[in-house]
Every structure is written in C-alpha cells, then in structure tokens.
C-alpha cells in the first residue's frame, strides 16, 4: 500500500499510521476482526472491533477512489486534453462524485444536439455568439447545411453547443452545488391524501427546511412519502442570485447568451445538483439509520438471559387459538398445546383454556410465561394475568415477537422441529428469546427483528453487512458454548463458516460432548487457521482444563501455566484470586513474555471463569397484573423497558399494549443531541406519564420528574 493511503487513513480516523498498517497486515494474513480486537491488542494499540472495521472499510473506499482516478486520468490523457491543473484537481478530489464532475466534459457521450452541431461545423458560430458579433445572421447563413438548413436552425445548433459546454463547466457546477447546500430550502407539498389514510405523512403536507439542516429521519420520511405518491418534494432556490452569478461569466450579452444561461441553469445544472444533493442526503441518512439500527441490535442481543427457568411460550391469536410451548431450563422443548383463551371462542372454550393453562403451570412448575406482542396480545395478557392470580410464584413478560414468524417458517426451524406447525415453532422461539435472546435471535435475519428506523428504505446490502458485523461482534464478545450452540450461532464465531459449524454439530451428535478445546481440532475441515481464529471464543463449561471455559486463547496456555507455578496456584479459589489481583501487570507481563493488555484480559477471565458479560445488562421486567391505558394518569410514575430508539426519541414498554414514546425533548432538563446518548434498547427506565390519548391509543412519557421539571 502507498504511504499516502496509510497517512490518509490515520489522519481521517485519528489513529497512528502504525496502527492502520498493522490492522491491514493482520487482515491480509486472514485474521478476523473479533480475533484481532481480542487477541492482538498489543499490535493494534488496543483498537476495538468498530475501529478495526472502520480501517478496513475506509481502505476499500480509498482504493475504489484511487482506481477511479487512475482510470479517468488515463482516459483524459488519451484524448490529449490532460492539463497539469486538471490532473492536480482530479488527484486532490476526496469524493467519487467530485472525480465524476471533473471528468464530465471529457466523458464519452451518446450523440446529443451539441454533438450534431459540432459535427456540422457550428463551433465557430458559437464563438461568435460569445463575442456578441453584429454579423451573426450572415455568419449563420454561411454555415447552413442539410442538417441545419436555415440560419435560425444554425444559430439554435450553436446555442446547443454553448449550453452543453456551459452546463459541464466544473466551476459553475461546484458553485451551484455549494449554493444549494448552504442556502436553499427543501420543501414538500401534498400530492394525494387518499394514499395516506392514517395521515402518517401529515407533517410533510406543507413542509420546508434548510437543506444543510435537514435531519436524517426527515430525509428518509420525505423519500418514502414521495415514493408512495403522497407528497411532492422539491427545492426552493434564490434563482435571482444564481442568475447574477452565471451572467457575470459573460462579458457580452445578447438573447442567445440569455438562453444559454437559463437553459444551463434551470434545465441542466440545478437538476443535476439537486439529484446529487438528494443522493448525498439519502446516503448520510441511511448511514445514520443503519448506525442506529446496529446500536439497537447490539443492545437487544446483549439483554441479560433468564437462565435456569422453566418457561412457557405463548403465541397469541384470535380465531386459530393461542399456541403454547413449554421449554425446560436448557431451552429443550417439553410439550406444545393449543388453547382458545379469547373471543370469538365460546365461554366454555375460554373456561377450558384457563384450566389447561393452570394444569401446565402446575405440571411443569412454570416460572415465567413469555407472551408474544402481536395479534391478540392485549387480550391474551389479560387472560394470563387472571390465571396467575392463583399462582403467585409465576410471572409473565411481554416479548417482542418481531421475526418469530420469519424464523418459524424457515428451513432452520423446519430442521429443528420437523413435526410441528409454524405457529408452535413460533411459540418455542418466543420462550427461548427470554431464556437466551442472543442464541435465539441469531437464527433470524437481523432486518426482521424490528429495532430500526426506516430499515426497509435504506441500502439493504449495506444494512445487512453492518448488522452481520454487529451479530458477529456480540457473539464473539459473549463467547459460545461449543456443546450446546446451534450451527447458526456457531457460524458467527470467528473463523467458522456454515460448513464447519454444521460439522461441529454433527461431530457432537456422533461422539458426544466435546471435552476440550484441543478436541475441536478433530472436527472435519476445521484446520489450523480456523482453530486459531475460533478457539478463544468457544467455551467448554465442564472441561478438565478450566481455561477452556474462559476467553484465554490456547496460545497463552503455556504462559498461564508458568503464572500458576510462579504463584503456586492449583485451583482458582479465593486465595488464588487474591494473588492474581495483587500482581504487578507490567513486571509479570515481561516475565511471561506477554503484552500487558493480554495479561490484563487473562486475569479478568481467571477471576470470573465462565463469566457472561450479558449478566451486567438489564433483565426483562416481570409482571403479574395487567395494566391498561385507561388506568394511567398524567404524572404517574412507572418502570419500563426501552424497546426501540429512534432519532426523535425512544419507545418504552410499561406494560400496556402500546409502547409509550419519550420524545427527545422529554429525556432531560438539559439539551440532548441524540436519544442514544441517554437510553439504549433493553434499558430499564423510570418514567412519568405526560399524555394519554385514549381515542388514538397513544401514550407519551417523560424521563423528567414533573415535580423537578421547572
């Protein structure tokens, strides 16, 4: 790689050149992002996964930009038109769009009016127009031809030449771009209200904002409303100012020049710059939406698992009945059943449903009922709460079932439960989401999980890449039990792919539990490189070697053995842990031939072997009584769980059917730049009711105590 690229990367990302170079070298050697972040900290200067990904992504972008520059320079040079000034401008361009703007006048075009006019020899006439020649008519008559048989048509052809040249002038286009970006407004007006029955886009029926200040979520809303045909989006410019600037380029003036200015400005340059700015606004908005979705997804995947609980999954429905699934403490399916707990079922069927649910609770000692939040959720919650009056030891939780139906109809679900209906598989998924959200949610396309903002309006390729990165990062940070993980979960482990993951599951089924990390090497097609990349992230809870249930990499086992001998440690009891805490990191690292960061991580793992970082995050709120919107009053204090974070606020589940909105203005008494600075998906928060709209079934909440708001 050229030094210029490394320096640009380092400068743009605020890193040392050596860090950038090291990351790119490690990546070229086949190391994964999770592996580099966790086990090569000394080499990278302790960069995390996001920083490493940023280096890799920006390197690709810079390479693409550089390749395009070289192609453009070669093509212009082949035409004999490459000046030193143009070459310097292309080489200095920081965006692909700027390179294309500079290349525009030299780009091969389909035959245009201007092309035909030039071929007919009308260029000298165009020059005479610029000079405001008094003999235009006579000169035009000299240049008439079969294609341009009259002087009027010849003059029109000459004007076409000037319009094309003028509209491709880079300095004019650049000035216009900056003028629109800094000083123009973007507006929207109602086009067809019949396409917006719920008035979702009402705010955009008559909307205006500065282009430079337009927020990302508004950009995406305008795009969607325009695409649906509800609104018309346009720009409002200072055309008089633009016209003055364009006119100043001409020393002479005449009607033909005026036409060149108007045609170039209104028909060529402004539309082109509007398209570019809309595209850039959309790209920035998409990046923001994807970043927010990624952040929400990470927090959702890190929700604390409810381990060791007997759970009943409850997939609500009206006509077809609720599907129930009982899973044991390990997530293994025990039984399924269908009951009819809500209308239109008869009273006799509802009474039978109560008895059936009560029998299941008693028979299997159900501790928690996980109710899906879809159709008939509110009625099902009331039904469950009524039954639980006789079972004070049992609670219920409303679980976000987004994507459960996608999973239940998937090939993976059919393979897991070939004899069950789609609905029963969905109930199992709902129950397991409570027990181990990460293990269950990795089975679902992240886009279907429903914690985003306009996720269907953004680049699906870019969204998938970023969400996959989040899933991979979280899975490896948490670690995976190699003996219980599904092949889907294993496939997200560093160094493993679909085939190797399936081979691990097949190996377990054939040989029983894997007893040690060393045994993992026996799995077919799991070679030395895959083992190196994966081993530290795979856990074996009951292994003879306690290190096999930690994040300590096998490459560090000899050093840990030396450490144990040095400290006379034979077991990780309290005495051993005190010795580890008292270590001088710098001296010990040097003695063991380890980096300080690596030793620090090793000690953290030894102090808490088998630790699950998700245990530090919030667990779901357990309930026994149902709460309805009509029960709420303004100023009432409640506890809730953050379900989704968007640019304008956050949605919180407080136990009523509809999630309440905390607008960004209600998040703090001081200014909040973005909701994600205050709350995250999965957070438990104390809120106060600020508005209850029974008619539209909407709820507004606040994080600010009304008694302290002034």
Functional labels for PLM-detected ranges:
Residues 16-17, 29-30, 96, 122, ...:
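Short flexible coil/turn linkers enriched for glycine and charged/polar residues
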Residues 32, 44, 48-149, 477-616, ...:
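Accessory alpha-helical DNA-binding modules that contact the DNA backbone or grooves
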Residues 51-53, 65-75, 79-313, 317-419, ...:
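Duplex nucleic acid-engaging cores and interfaces of nucleic-acid transaction enzymes
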Residues 98, 397, 403, 408-478, ...:
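Long, charge-rich intrinsically disordered scaffolds of nucleic-acid metabolism proteins
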Residues 139-141, 147-151, 207-210, 229, ...:
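Low-complexity, acidic/Ser/Thr- and charged residue-rich accessory regions of DNA metabolism proteins
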Residues 178-186, 314-318, 375-379, 399-406, ...:
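A glycine-rich phosphate-binding loop feature that marks nucleotide/adenosyl-phosphate handling sites
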Residues 276-294, 448-479, 587-634:
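Long, charged amphipathic helices and adjacent flexible linkers at domain junctions
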